[in-house]
Amino acid sequence: MPRPIEALIHPDALAHNLLQARRHAGDAKLWAVIKANAYGHGIERVWPALLGADGLAMLDLDEAQRVRNLGWRGPVLLLEGCFEARDLELCSRLNLWHVVHHDDQIGWLAAHKTHQPHRVFLKMNSGMNRLGFTPQALRSAWVRLNALPQVDEISLMTHFSDADSPRPGADGIAAQVARFVEATHDLPGERSLSNSAAILRHCERAEVRADWVRSGILSYGSSPDHPQHDIGHWNLRPAMTLRSRLIATQQLQAGDSVGYGSRFVAQQPMRIGIVACGYADGYPRHAPGDTGNATPVLVDGLRTHTVGRVSMDMLAVDLSELPAAGVGSEVTLWGHGPHGSLLPIDAVAQAAGTIGYELMCALAQRVPTHVQDLEPR
């Protein structure tokens, strides 16, 4: 039989999370962000849930082609725009919307021979300092785009750096909103400002809600402002479960160590379980398993923690308080466990010093992945 590890993808959880985004976004239209193969979940696996969105947003043309091949006829937005001039031909053929965030992209459009005008989102850098025109340069970019016969409607967008929580001494999104509104107040076109954190925390304000919101990490059941708020606070459901089983147990005596580097040393007699999961499966090698500083897991739905260093194919967990656990017991690394138990990916990520996004996207190809709705149909 194969190794007992598997990932389960829950499309109905994603559909539920998109409904929560809509509840916060009011009358704004909803982009479901599916970059990085739907944050590691697999576009095709979550496809039924995506039908509840108004548009699909991603990064590359391959993913755009995939959703068109799946039958999506609604708006598709390339969040980083075109990477070279020849991308415009496929944008035209697939009827893709694309972001314009630098001068070269305007030049490519000006030289492009198209059968139909392009729908673009002109991006302003309001403080994130990754992509976009400065407030001072935005109007000139808009004028140049508006003069091109290759361009149809021009929408406007920006991206928040601190929507999850304000930096000390800063004012969250207020300064970025003010810059965007001042620079665009007399320009026509739809607007898109809100990412996941802004949808949940700030969309009661009409200028933040605007015309389109972009639901990213919240769609997949991770809280964008964890640890301030967990998924229960936002009524989100994990759309991915990573689970395995115990394949061995060991009885330790005081002074015995566990794993490479002997990072964990038993202070008293204890029992541990060995789980068929390691960093080659996408579990973080740096997840701590030290005394007083360990990473949570569920065994048969009951919470315990890792011990020792994560290996390529295995990790160890503390069974001291779980006398019924043994070989074959189910281990939930994150997501939904048995008997209604739950281990949010954010809790694992926080212990490992990372974020849920990274764990989702790091799921290894060798892990068998199946689609399983949470609710019976």
From Swiss-Prot:
Catalytic activities: L-alanine = D-alanine
Gene Ontology CC: cytosol
Keyword Isomerase annotated: yes
Family annotation (CDD domains): PLPDE_III_AR_proteobact (cd06827)
Pathway(s) per entry: Amino-acid biosynthesis; D-alanine biosynthesis; D-alanine from L-alanine: step 1/1
GO molecular function terms listed in the Swiss-Prot or TrEMBL record: alanine racemase activity; pyridoxal phosphate binding
E.C. code: 5.1.1.1
InterPro entries for this protein: Ala_racemase, Ala_racemase/Decarboxylase_C, Ala_racemase_C, Ala_racemase_N, Ala_racemase_pyridoxalP-BS, PLP-binding_barrel
Encoding gene (name): alr
Stored Pfam families: Ala_racemase_C, Ala_racemase_N
Residue list for modification N6-(pyridoxal phosphate)lysine: 35
Keyword set, alphabetical order: Isomerase, Pyridoxal phosphate
Protein name: Alanine racemase
Cofactor: pyridoxal 5'-phosphate
Membrane-spanning parts: none
Binding site for substrate: 130, 312
Gene Ontology biological-process entries: D-alanine biosynthetic process
Annotated organism of origin: Leptothrix cholodnii (strain ATCC 51168 / LMG 8142 / SP-6)
Cysteine pairs bridged by disulfides in the record: none
